[in-house]
């Protein structure tokens, strides 16, 4: 039987027809891929060319082995059948396009039957995978796909099924070997395969391939091209570790005094790293990130999958301007939406479940850095949400804790524990802000110290010399403040000779143990208190734990999923009787991370969602007592004192300042504004009673604050400028 390419159609050779089809489809495909590549390479520099061994291992596991895809067993099996099948059958496309020259002349005769069998296995695998996927989409539609257009996905599946079925017909016309090509042999025996049928099957096969090549770069199936580099250039840093503003040639963070940056964070497409931009084309639209996002589940504006789609849609819409080096009028933050940017809890559940290693969170934290350090202005839709956070930032600047409580009270929780304070010790217990000032958390800190002393450990605390680790400031986008806090704490550690730190707070555990390494904390060992307790139990220095009643455990994001510690907390309490529906690496975020603890919450849905996960496991009713967060005082005052606010806003012009000075001016301006406004507010007795007592809004404190800020302002402005207030 003649090969279809050797047949003439209306006097035109099949070779010429295939040449035209191939040139058009391959040319279009190549153009679109190179366009996407050019748009990706417009991104900021990002060194992802280190650790080649780790990258090859990750590629073999995640891309070739489909490890993350298989974490969803239903969709995973279907995708693996299609993926591995497509890899095996792709070589046959070249053979068919060459008129079987590849298999006849380039492959050794002994290998040819095995290769034919592998190709048939590939077609069979892909066909089964597509059939199952199509049935799932049409007959058993998952909840996350309902209400969404599935035309594109269904068309792609039908095209692949067409490629596979026509391949079996072509194979049947070539006289298949029943030992290796069982399906082709069955088709040949069951049906009458003529030259005409083979010709029709061949051209249907080729048209389906050409159509597929047209659709790939225009659809979500561009991930067939971009997923491989996306996985290979994954972030080898620990999960959730944020990068410093600037690093030197040794990879160490540049000190605040030596920073040389034109802008902070990212508001423009080209300010995102090139690796971050690949994500837009590598996304498979599987919606796994959407399924695990606590912000999305609680009804907020953030959809992590949409953030990734926004990167690609923004690039395509503004491609001409971007390639000319011009900035579009719309920035990337506007495309994301400020409400989405501020809704992220940085739990990294989206990053953890993504089958192609997409990095969602850095895009949002870079946007926060720009909003917090560069603009210092917020959209009206998020103003009432973010304003309490601004008060927290100011408290961190003045008192090194988010509550605004004086630093000299930081060690009061351990006053009667007979523990070393700011003295050398084998273990330093880093209490953190919550355990230092919150009554409920103080008990955790006191019990931890008691356990360590019972085990005979040499333990101390830093007392008033301890400062906030800076997690909230960094996740809020105030990298400048975080770096100040980090450098101050590291100086204290060096002065006292700290080598081992124990922390009860998962956020402090991550920040001190992972992120401080960029600032000089490489030689400090940091452990969670549950890890230490478990270690002491194994050594026999502590008795085996016992508990009565049914108990469960909620894995904190920054200890479990991000820190990788899942067993120590369970072992320390003697095991759990029942696991929640979402536990371990899949634990559902409590909603307080990413500085959300210090933002105004307009809905309790996220809290009730978390509680419902525990209640569904037949536990006794879960109760929680949430402290009332102070209302946005500045927002309220803007309504009560509009003339005063406007007068202060018009006092300072910042255009003449350099970048670094300008940021300091912005902070000082807001601090002075806050002081005067709240001083005016304190004149009203009814308003004083509304303020939470733990914020210490006493007149004497305000007088001291006025004097402190005046001294700081004078010290900064005397260098270059005279600021008149």
Task: Name each model feature, range by range.
Residues 2-132, 139, 271-280, 302-308, ...:
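Iron-sulfur-cluster electron-transfer modules
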Residues 21-28, 127, 161-162, 196-232:
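Alpha-helical membrane-embedded segments
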Residues 29-47, 99-102, 132-153, 169-180, ...:
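Juxtamembrane/interface segments at transmembrane-helix termini
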Residues 48-49, 71-76, 108-118, 142-162, ...:
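Membrane-interface segments at loop-to-transmembrane junctions
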Residues 80-90, 155-175:
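Hydrophobic alpha-helical membrane-insertion segments
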Residues 213-341, 715, 720:
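Ferredoxin-type iron-sulfur electron-transfer modules and their immediate structural context
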Residues 281-296, 342-356, 432-436, 465-477, ...:
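Local cysteine-cluster metal-coordination motifs and their immediate loop/turn environment
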Residues 522-545, 582-588, 642-677:
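Short, flexible loop segments at boundaries between secondary-structure elements
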């Amino acid at each position: 039987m003649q090969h279809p390419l050797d047949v003439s159609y209306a006097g035109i050779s099949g070779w010429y027809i295939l040449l035209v089809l191939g040139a058009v489809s391959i040319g279009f495909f190549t153009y679109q891929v190179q366009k996407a590549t050019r748009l990706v390479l417009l991104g900021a520099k990002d060194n992802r060319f280190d650790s080649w061994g780790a990258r090859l291992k990750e590629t073999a596991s995640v891309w070739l082995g489909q490890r993350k895809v298989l974490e969803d067993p239903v969709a995973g099996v279907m995708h693996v059948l299609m993926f591995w099948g497509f890899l095996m059958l792709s070589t046959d496309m070249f053979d068919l396009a060459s008129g079987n020259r590849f298999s006849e002349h380039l492959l050794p005769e002994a290998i040819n039957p095995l290769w034919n069998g592998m190709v048939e296995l590939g077609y069979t695998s892909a066909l089964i995978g597509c059939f199952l996927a199509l049935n799932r989409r049409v007959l058993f539609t998952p909840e996350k796909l309902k209400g969404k257009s599935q035309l594109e996905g269904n068309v792609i599946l039908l095209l692949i099924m067409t490629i596979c079925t026509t391949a079996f017909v072509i194979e049947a016309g070539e006289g298949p070997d029943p030992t290796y090509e069982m399906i082709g042999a069955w088709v040949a025996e069951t049906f009458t395969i003529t030259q005409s049928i083979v010709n029709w099957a061949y051209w249907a096969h080729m048209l389906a391939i050409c159509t597929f090549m047209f659709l790939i770069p225009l659809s979500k199936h561009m991930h067939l091209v971009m997923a491989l580099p996306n996985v290979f250039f994954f972030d080898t840093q620990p999960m959730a570790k944020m990068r410093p503003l600037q690093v030197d040639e040794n990879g160490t963070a540049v000190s605040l005094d030596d920073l040389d940056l034109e802008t902070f964070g990212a508001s423009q497409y080209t300010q995102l790293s090139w690796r971050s931009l690949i994500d837009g084309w590598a996304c498979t639209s599987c919606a796994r990130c959407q399924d695990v996002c606590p912000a999305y589940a609680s009804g907020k504006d953030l959809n992590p999958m949409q953030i990734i789609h926004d990167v690609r849609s923004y690039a395509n819409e503004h491609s001409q301007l971007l390639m000319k080096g011009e900035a579009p009028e719309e920035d990337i933050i506007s495309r994301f939406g400020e409400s989405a940017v501020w809704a992220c809890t940085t739990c990294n559940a989206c990053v953890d479940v993504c089958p192609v290693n997409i990095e969602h969170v850095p895009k949002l934290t870079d946007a926060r850095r720009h909003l917090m350090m560069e603009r210092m202005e917020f959209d009206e839709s998020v103003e009432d949400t973010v304003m309490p956070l601004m008060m927290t930032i100011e408290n961190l600047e003045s008192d090194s804790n988010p509550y605004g409580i004086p630093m000299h009270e930081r060690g009061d929780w351990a006053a009667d524990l007979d523990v070393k304070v700011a003295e050398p010790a084998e273990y330093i217990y880093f209490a953190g802000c919550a355990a230092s000032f919150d009554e409920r958390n103080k008990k955790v800190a006191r019990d931890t110290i008691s356990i360590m002393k019972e085990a005979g450990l040499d333990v101390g605390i830093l007392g008033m010399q301890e400062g906030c680790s800076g997690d909230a400031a960094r996740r809020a986008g105030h990298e400048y403040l975080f770096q100040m806090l980090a450098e101050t704490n590291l100086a204290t550690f060096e002065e006292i000779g700290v080598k081992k730190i124990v922390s009860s707070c998962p956020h402090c555990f991550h920040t001190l143990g992972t992120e401080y390494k960029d600032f000089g904390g490489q030689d400090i060992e940091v452990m969670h208190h549950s890890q230490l307790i478990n270690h002491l139990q194994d050594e026999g220095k502590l008795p085996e734990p016992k508990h009565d009643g049914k108990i469960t455990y909620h894995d904190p994001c920054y200890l479990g999923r991000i820190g990788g510690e899942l067993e120590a907390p369970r072992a320390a309490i003697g095991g759990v009787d029942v696991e929640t529906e979402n536990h371990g690496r899949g634990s559902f975020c409590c909603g307080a991370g990413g500085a959300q603890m210090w933002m105004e919450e307009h809905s309790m849905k996220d809290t009730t969602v978390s509680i419902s996960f525990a209640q569904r496991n037949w536990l006794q009713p879960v109760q929680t007592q949430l402290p009332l967060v102070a209302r946005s005082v500045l927002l309220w005052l803007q309504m009560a004192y509009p003339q005063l606010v406007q007068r202060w806003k018009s006092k300072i012009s910042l255009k003449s300042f350099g970048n670094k000075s300008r940021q300091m001016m912005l902070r000082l301006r807001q601090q002075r504004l806050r002081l005067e406004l709240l001083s005016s507010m304190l004149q009203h007795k009814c308003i004083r009673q509304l303020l939470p007592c733990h914020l210490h809004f006493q007149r004497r404190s305000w007088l001291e604050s006025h004097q402190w800020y005046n001294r700081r302002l004078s010290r900064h402005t005397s260098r270059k400028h005279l600021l008149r207030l």
